């Protein structure tokens, strides 16, 4: 997990009502690292004290043991799902990013299906939302 985000440039860009494009690279002792996009997004959300973080995946969101979408889940429930192998594989690093963000001030993280057209707009501008909301 990145330990420092230099967010001054991001804040300046956002103040100009522009959307920044971020290449998730990290530096340590003159060495460059490629950081997983979800991990970088979580670290940026924490550093900007964001209310919400949206992460995209190739699933509807977090699925229960019957493979049905869970619309809202708490951090403790997610940890239990990992323990019981309901959440596994590549979803675990994404969930860990969610949990880290939530435990560091982000109010909620939503995992949405990036394959569905307009899923982010649906999440932002509808009462029902899209995907899974993970909350503290």
Regions found by a protein language model. Name each.
Residues 1-136:
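C-terminal catalytic "cap/lid" subdomain
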């Amino acid at each position: 997990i990145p330990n420092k985000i230099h967010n001054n440039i991001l804040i300046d860009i956002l103040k100009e009502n522009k959307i920044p494009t971020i290449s998730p690279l990290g530096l340590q002792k003159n060495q460059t690292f490629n950081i997983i996009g979800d991990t970088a997004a979580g670290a940026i959300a924490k550093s900007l004290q964001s209310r919400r973080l949206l992460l995209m995946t190739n699933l509807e969101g977090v699925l229960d043991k019957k493979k049905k979408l869970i619309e809202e889940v708490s951090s403790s429930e997610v940890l239990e799902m990992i323990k019981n192998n309901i959440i596994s594989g590549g979803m675990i690093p994404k969930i860990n990013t969610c949990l880290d963000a939530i435990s560091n001030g982000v109010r909620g993280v939503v995992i949405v299906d990036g394959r569905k057209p307009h899923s982010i707009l649906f999440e932002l501008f509808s009462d029902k939302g899209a995907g899974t909301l993970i909350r503290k």
